[in-house]
């Protein structure tokens, strides 16, 4: 009886051992979802942050990227991939909190949070600092090629509507950032929910379309760096990297106003390794790591302690750290209501599709004209050939 009991017990133990470990037990692996080109990766003698973290902690990092807050949000909503750390912007964090999509952080596992400056804590998007830890802050401005675009023109967002530069202008390919530029030009808040003001912004964006080369996001980096475009809205931090490769590039904080933002590290609901995620967040907050990381990506640090490790050229740059007068023209995004967001999305779709019928009509018209010309050319050639044949026959006769 005892033998049968122990045999059954042994069989049960072996069966349990054979079962795959539950996903949450994978304490040696995390998946991070971040903006493109937004972490020091070891190129140009920089610190490979992910590799250094893996070697120090033994935790493997699966690293994926997105190109806008909206695409990141859609990915989280639709599922399919589980993330442990995400790095959205301020207004998107507020949206994720309101929809109960973030895990509260255990700050006992993030002692390096102590290095985050008070000015970056308890922000409106996360007033109790329950769900987020600041990663960087920065501004959106106008990047332009000084060989082709004057400094005077680049002082205003209207540069992106200037027909002198037609075909060489780029625009953000997402509604929130595109509308922000139009709203600044019209003197409206970047957070307006007024339907009339949104429509005016959409109308202004529609007038820009004929002079644009393309609506793009991350591609702005390469197109401006290679000189394929002459002016585009983009992030101050990236400009400092781009200008090293193309010294002809300039940067301005347009006089009408611009967006200032904080990107912060969060843990989404459904994460598989919360402790590993908090270890990663804590690692990025370590002043020497933060400094090495931000020295490379060019964005501004929310840690005074990190500046002690950073290049003087970076921390004294008016692009990365604007003066008070320049900062006074900035405005942070706030979460918009569902209704205002939907209205903006609908208007953006109308902007993107406007003129498509006219373009199609023009293409069809040109094709028809070309067909008619080709018909007459061929007809003339056939008639000429027949005439030559008749002439030969007449001579032979």
Question: Model segments located where?
Answer:
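Early extracytoplasmic/lumenal segment of secretory-pathway proteins
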Residues: 25-95, 361
